[in-house]
Amino acid sequence: MSSPAKKRKRNGVDISPQKTRSIESFFKGPAAQQPNQSEPQPEVTEQTLSDEALARKLQEEWNQEGNSPSVAVESNEPTSTELEASASTLTPSIPTDITPFAATTSSQMPKKNTLSLQSSAGTEDSVSLTVPLDQNPQTFDTAKYVAELRAHWTSQGGDASYALLTKAFVLANATTSRIKIVDTLVNFLRLLIEADPSSLLPAVWLATNSISPPFDELELGLGGSSISKALKKIYGLDNQGLKTLYDKHGDAGDVAFEAKKRQAFTLVKPKPLKIKGVYQSLLKIGTSKGTGSQETKQRIVEKLLQDTRGAEESRYIVRTLVQNLRIGAVKTTMLIALARAFLYSKPTGADFEVRSQQELARLKKDELAEMYSNAEEIVKASYARHPNYNDLVPCLLETGVTEELLIRCGLALHIPLRPMLGSITRDLSDMLTKLQGRDFSCEYKYDGQRAQVHCDEKGKVSIFSRHLELMTEKYPDLVSLVPQIRGEGVSSFILEGEVVAVDQATGDLQPFQTLTNRAKKNVEIGAITVDVCLFSFDLMYLNGEPLLDRPFRERRELLRSLFVEIPNRFTWVKSIDATSADSETVLEFFKSATDTKCEGIMVKVLDNTIKINDLKESTQAINGKNLPDNTNQHTEPSESTKPTKEKSNRRKALLSTYEPDKRLESWLKVKKDYSTSSETLDLIPVAGWHGQGRKAKWWSPILLAVRNPESGVLEAVTKCMSGFTDKFYQANKDKYVAGSPNVISRPSWVQYYGEPDIWFEPQEVWEMAFADITLSPTYPAAIGLVSEERGLSLRFPRFLKVREDKSIEEATTSDYLALLWRKQADRTKNSPGQQEDTGWQEE
């Protein structure tokens, strides 16, 4: 008997015969194909039924068995049972050649597990995809798009769609231009500010590869196996099919893109993903703990993939899950984009001022640049003092980019500020030259772990690392010290110091490796085997008042007068005060530091003023030359009144204030490595080649890169095959094995002209020694900084060690590499043409 005719809701889209057949062609053929009821019908069996008729028959049996109405083609709210069935029992495995998922034959179809299918074509958000986000913000008119986007989002639930964020990711990924990337993010943020401000904060987190600040300890905790399992289940891949895609593309996001693109049908119509919804799903993953948490996480991942509309959404959902968007945006890109977006746009009802589109369009290039720079400085300063988007974004929505932002979102207890960093000098002579005319302090640079200690009026203590990670549980012995070191009248504070492993009996310093033997969590005081001492060197907050704008001399005096020293447990860094005229004294102090197992010395400007008499004396001590007597005896530091194109001739103002997240020459570090003939750089391994001969089973040589601080691009600088042990080679090969998440396809954010055998996921920093820096036609590092046609490379690079204490954002920059090259050229007095790399010296 034939199954009764069913009225089904059409998709409303005419599909030509050449395109993929819609679901109606399976469940409801054309009227012309209906059997003539007056003619005798043959006996119907599963073997004689067509695919379409069998599908109708099985659908009816499914519905009758469940005693429920037919599953609607347009269902937007699949139940968890439907999703489980859709993924586990109905999605066929893809063969090795990865053919698209299509209808199976009648003999393959499970008899009682049939759900309605949806064509995966045409489900993308056409409204969001047509917005030209990469336009210049001066000409991008949000008024043209806000009303339509609001109406579109309202029709789909009311919140901003993930499709718009995906559009921004796609455009950012398609260019290496920093300007284009920033423009794209600015316009995207403006649309959210005006059309859906409540989605702005989730969007910022999603666009910065994070779900919370580093001190919140909220992590997704998803392994590669979870992503692979979800890809197989949702997109119908078998193990071999998944491996084929991974081998071809190397990136989990690209694998998801290809799998989604080849998927002809989905079991239910995807429910549009929302920016808020995706972020909330990630929070649920991060907060899932205990029994059953892995299953909960897996279901959330699968639901996200199930609801993606289009291959690009799939790509960026997976990249978000592995927390590597690969869109060429660096840490500061989002801060710049936020600052600029709030110059153009504000939410409905906000009372801060913004510039009109017409007014901004009339600004000259230098006027616009100055306006941008001022806004960016405010936002960056606020974030450096209070690095939490959960607080920064709501304040921006209320105040815009104003000085009030620094007050409302400024320094706060138990929120770590980003630490101030010291510039590197080549040697003591270089340091003395930089600090002519200044009083400065020389401090031992201990070989330990930098720590930021917070204590409030109630006695609560938090300890943070230089990367802002919470490590209070690692140092319960330091926490117990706080009541003893806090002097009379001290109610709350933020101080900074170096935690060093010591012998409590003798006070002898222990190497950093000893400190690494400490457990990171759940450390009990009675079980501590590695004793530590906190050598404090700065005080940034006292009794509710920030001290960042106070001179270093004053901050140091408050620290040493208001806190109590406890020998071998809490004390001050060893230091001396000097000027450039005291070169012999400084040299002796430097030698004593290196003899005491320290890395070298830190040199810090004490005051905000220059003493001209000292400037003359120090200049004579260094080079025997007198300065022209055309200045006052005491003056404030300032930029040169006669700017020149030569950066080396420009004297920057050196203030003694504490500048969070800035690397300034008012703090200089002189390490013992820098005082020898061999310089070191912190480079990022990005690729490798198959070794030859004895090294054939390993990766050798290995390609290394410096970081461009402006674009975030990693610029190849050298290949290295020296300094590695066989044990290291094997561990490196095991880590970067084909098919693992540590191996990727050629990345757009790594600049190199050659073709390595394998590309590494950039994640490590290696300390490298070398003989010289050379101009090179082979490597792009620092190209444009010293030559328009050549980059820089290293002669005879040698691996020293992995810098486990550094992230890739702290690797050597192309700017610094160019600076070293210039200094080298000045020393050797060779012309650039005499220092050219033919491309083979490093091997």
Where are the regions that the model predicts?
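Structural signature of nuclease core domains in nucleic-acid processing machines
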Residues: 700-701, 706-731, 735, 758-759, ...
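Flexible, glycine/threonine-enriched loop-and-boundary segments that flank and lead into catalytic domains
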Residues: 421-441, 583-589, 605-693
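C-terminal structured "cap/appendage" subdomains that terminate the fold
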Residues: 736-795
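Detector for conserved single-position "signature" residues within domains
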Residues: 591-598
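N-terminal nucleic-acid-engaging modules of covalent nucleotidyltransferase systems
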Residues: 2-582, 611, 623, 630-636, ...
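Short beta-turn/strand-loop junction motif enriched in small, turn-promoting residues
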Residues: 688-694, 709, 773
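C-terminal catalytic or substrate-handling cores of phosphate/nucleotide-
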Residues: 559, 666, 672, 676, ...
